[in-house]
Structure formats: structure tokens, C-alpha cells
């Protein structure tokens, strides 16, 4: 039985913000233009890419890289705006723990809540530990991770949610190393 199975049976209080707070963050003209060009058999019945060979497909994928590389900065900008609106801190990576931590965990998802409590307990005993929470995984942006990592870190444990038999490491671990 995994954590997901445990969490799906829990009840938690959630504070939901009024969507009116976020209206200024949305470019409605761009959203409408996007909706008009998406594949929808009812409103925009078209076929795309049905005759691409490998070389053309690869060129198209490579052309996207320029735009894909811009995503972390755009997401970080919007996270900052949402932080201002809500009064909560949002960022691609956040750090919790001792400012002079020597050992840290890097993780994402539900395990971070348990790790948070463990870090509190270890820091109460005088240990220099911390955790980096991953909030933006793809595209992975190490520059944002390094911004929050204490310069005193000597050891890193990566807790991944995936187990890939036969692999030299799991996806998050491979991104970190």
C-alpha cells in the first residue's frame, strides 16, 4: 500500500482563493487564440503531421527547444505574481531547513510533508539538515535549484517517486547529478 493510497482516504481543510484574484494574470486574447488553433473535431477539424517522416518530425521537435527553454523563467514570474496575490511563497524550488545545512534531501510530492517534520526533529537535536522541494519538474531548471541550496551542503539524498528497474538512477536523481 503506497502513500497515494493512504492520502486518497484523508480529509484535509483547503483554503481556496477566489478566481477573481487571478484574472489579471490571464491574457484572455492569447487564450482565445490558442483555443481556436487547437485540435478539436467539433470546432476546428484539421489533420496535422499525418505525413511527417522522422527527419521532419525531429526538426519540429528541435524548433520547440527555444520556446521550451523559456518556460522556467515564465513559470517563475507567474509564481512570483501569485505569491504577491496570495501572500504565500511560490517558486520553482523552495528550501526548508537550517541555513547552514550540510545534508539535504531533494524531493517532490507528498513525501515533502513527512520530510518537513523529520527536518524539524533533527534540527531540534542540533543537526544541520534541510530539504529542497521541487515544484517545477519539467523542464528541469537547475539554476533555480542552485539559488536556494545552501553553499554549506556536503551530502544530498534524492527521494524519487519512481523506481526504474535496470536504470542507473531514477529521473529526478539523474537530473540532480
Give the positions of each predicted feature.
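Thiamine diphosphate
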Residues: 1, 5, 76-177
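Conformationally flexible catalytic loops at phosphate/diphosphate-handling active centers
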Residues: 5-95
Amino acid at each position: 500500500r503506497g502513500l497515494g493510497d493512504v492520502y486518497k482516504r484523508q480529509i484535509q481543510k483547503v483554503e481556496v482563493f477566489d478566481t477573481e484574484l487571478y484574472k489579471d494574470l490571464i491574457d484572455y486574447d492569447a487564450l482565445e487564440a490558442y483555443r481556436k488553433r487547437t485540435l478539436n473535431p467539433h470546432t476546428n477539424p484539421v489533420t496535422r503531421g499525418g505525413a511527417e517522416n522522422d527527419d521532419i518530425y525531429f526538426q519540429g521537435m528541435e524548433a520547440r527547444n527555444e520556446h521550451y527553454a523559456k518556460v522556467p523563467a515564465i513559470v517563475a514570474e507567474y509564481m512570483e505574481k501569485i505569491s504577491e496575490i496570495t501572500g504565500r511563497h511560490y517558486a520553482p524550488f523552495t528550501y526548508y531547513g537550517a541555513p547552514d545545512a550540510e545534508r539535504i534531501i531533494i524531493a517532490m510530492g507528498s513525501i515533502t510533508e513527512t520530510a518537513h517534520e523529520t527536518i524539524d526533529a533533527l534540527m531540534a537535536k542540533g543537526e544541520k539538515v534541510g530539504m529542497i522541494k521541487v515544484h517545477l519538474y519539467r523542464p528541469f531548471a537547475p539554476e533555480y535549484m542552485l539559488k536556494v541550496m545552501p553553499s554549506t551542503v556536503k551530502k544530498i539524498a534524492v527521494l524519487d517517486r519512481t523506481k526504474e528497474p535496470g536504470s542507473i538512477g531514477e529521473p529526478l536523481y539523474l537530473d540532480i547529478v
